[in-house]
């Protein structure tokens, strides 16, 4: 655990997958496509805590078009919080249509915009489309329900599943390692 905390101390950025991490991975399908996806407010609170502590966030998904609309709408909501409008938090960046091999390239390019390195980035993913990026970041994480092949190759496996608090588990780890008193953070 000490090794993981040392890695978490260095984190200044977080890249998240969509389905299976932000959302549960379950989709209610309708005649014209997906109708609903589920997520957990604890994860949203974890993201707010990280942003309040100065950590920049990106969502990187292979989905595009109508399938990515759920994630795009959620991030738009998060980016309309008063803390973003007032300039206290950086907006969350969304990358859609990003296939497995391109995720590393996209994350690297995004980090350069902030003058950050892969070593200063954490990422959370749940399946093979996330494997490459998880192998390159400073702190690789997976939700509890991630595929075994992913869990074998990450530094931290959250106790909770994707869409059920896994992001909050990772946020708590990072903030604790960095000695952040979450009771002192401005969350709106």
Over which residues does each language-model region extend?
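Mg2+-dependent phosphoryl-transfer enzymes with acidic/Ser/Thr/Gly-rich catalytic loops
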Residues: 36-37, 78-188
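Alpha-helical substrate-recognition element adjacent to the catalytic core
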Residues: 2-101
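A generic local structural motif
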Residues: 1-3, 42-45, 108-109, 126-129
């Amino acid at each position: 655990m000490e090794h993981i905390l040392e890695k978490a101390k260095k984190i200044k950025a977080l890249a998240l997958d969509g389905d299976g991490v932000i959302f549960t991975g379950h989709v209610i399908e309708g005649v014209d496509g997906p109708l609903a996806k589920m997520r957990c407010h604890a994860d949203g609170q974890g993201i707010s805590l990280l942003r309040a502590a100065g950590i920049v966030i990106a969502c990187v998904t292979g989905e595009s078009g109508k399938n990515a609309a759920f994630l795009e709408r959620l991030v738009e909501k998060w980016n309309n919080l008063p803390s973003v409008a007032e300039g206290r938090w950086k907006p969350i960046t969304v990358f859609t249509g990003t296939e497995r091999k391109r995720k590393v390239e996209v994350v690297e390019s995004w980090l350069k915009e902030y003058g950050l390195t892969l070593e200063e980035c954490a990422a959370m993913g749940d399946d093979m489309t996330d494997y490459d990026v998880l192998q390159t970041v400073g702190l690789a994480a997976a939700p509890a329900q991630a595929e075994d092949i992913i869990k074998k190759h990450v530094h931290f496996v959250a106790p909770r599943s994707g869409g059920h608090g896994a992001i909050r588990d990772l946020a708590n780890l990072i903030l604790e390692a960095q000695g952040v008193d979450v009771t002192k953070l401005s969350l709106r």
